[in-house]
Swiss-Prot record:
Family: Belongs to the MiaE family.
Assigned keywords, A-Z: Iron, Metal-binding, Monooxygenase, Oxidoreductase, tRNA processing
Name the UniProt record assigns to this protein: tRNA 2-(methylsulfanyl)-N(6)-isopentenyladenosine(37) hydroxylase
Cofactor binding, per record: Contains a nonheme dinuclear iron cluster.
Function: Involved in specific tRNA modification. Catalyzes the oxygen-dependent hydroxylation of 2-methylthio-N-6-isopentenyl adenosine (ms2i6A) to produce 2-methylthio-N-6-(cis-hydroxy)isopentenyl adenosine (ms2io6A) at position 37 in tRNAs.
CDD domains with a match to the protein in the record: MiaE
UniProt subunit comment: Homodimer.
Cofactor(s) required for function per UniProt: Fe cation
Length: 205
C-alpha cells in the first residue's frame, strides 16, 4: 500500500509546478544537491546517536538510517558519473536551517522538535521524488521511484521516535508549527534551485 497519501496529508502543501519545471530544467544542480542531502541526512543521524547515546531505540533507528543514506549518496554519485555530471560546490539551501530555527533549546522538547523537523524533511523528500518521477527519463525515474519506500519509512521512524519521547499534545502543536513554516518555505520565492527549495525567483513572478 502506498504511503504517499499519508505523507501528502502530513505536509501542508504539494510541491508547486514551478519548482518541478525548474528542477527538470536543471537536473545537474538537482542531482548534486540531492547527493549533498543524502550525506547531510546520514550526518544528522550520526550526530543524534552521539548526542543521545542512552536512547537505545533512537540509536538503533539512526544507525540503520545513516547506513541507508550513505548507500543512497553512493548511488547518486554513480548515477552522476554515468551521466557525466561533474562534482562542484553547491551551497546549502534555506530549507533545513529554516525549519531548525523552530527547535526549542531545552530538553526533552529539543529532541522531540528535532525529530518532528526530521519527519518533515523526509516526508518532503518522498513527496518530491513522487512529484518528479512521472517527468523523468527511465533511469532517473526508476531510481527516484526506488527511493520512495525508504524515505517514507524514515519519515515514519522520525515521527514514531518523537511520540516515544514527547507529550502528545505538545507534539501536535509542534507539528502544526513546523507544517506552517515548511509550507511557507516551499511556496515562497527562493533565490536558488535546491532539492528542498521554494520557487526559484525567475519562475516566482
Amino acid at each position: 500500500m502506498s504511503l504517499i497519501p499519508e505523507i501528502d496529508a502530513f505536509l501542508g502543501c504539494p510541491t508547486p509546478d514551478a519548482w518541478i519545471e525548474a528542477a527538470l530544467a536543471d537536473q545537474e544542480t538537482l542531482l548534486i544537491d540531492h547527493k549533498n542531502c543524502e550525506f547531510k541526512a546520514a550526518s544528522t543521524a550520526l550526530s543524534l546517536i552521539a548526542k543521545y547515546n542512552t536512547h537505545l531505540d533512537l540509536i538503533n533507528m539512526m544507525s540503520r538510517l545513516a547506513r541507508e543514506e550513505l548507500v543512497h549518496h553512493e548511488q547518486v554519485l554513480r548515477l552522476m558519473k554515468r551521466r557525466g555530471v561533474p562534482l562542484r560546490p553547491v551551497s546549502a539551501g534555506r530549507y533545513a536551517s529554516g525549519l531548525r530555527r523552530l527547535v526549542r533549546a531545552h530538553e526533552p522538547v529539543k529532541l522531540v522538535d528535532t525529530l518532528v523537523v526530521g519527519a518533515f524533511i523526509e516526508a518532503r523528500s518522498c513527496e518530491r521524488f513522487a512529484a518528479l518521477v512521472p517527468h523523468l527519463d527511465e533511469e532517473l525515474g526508476r531510481f527516484y521511484h526506488g527511493l520512495l519506500k525508504s524515505e517514507a519509512r524514515h519519515y515514519q521512524g522520525y515521527l514514531k521516535l518523537a511520540h516515544n519521547y514527547g507529550d502528545e499534545a505538545d507534539i501536535a502543536r509542534c507539528v502544526e508549527l513546523v507544517r506552517a513554516a515548511e509550507m511557507e518555505l516551499i511556496q515562497s520565492p527562493d533565490q536558488e534551485l535546491r532539492f528542498h527549495s521554494g520557487i526559484p525567483q525567475a519562475l516566482a513572478a
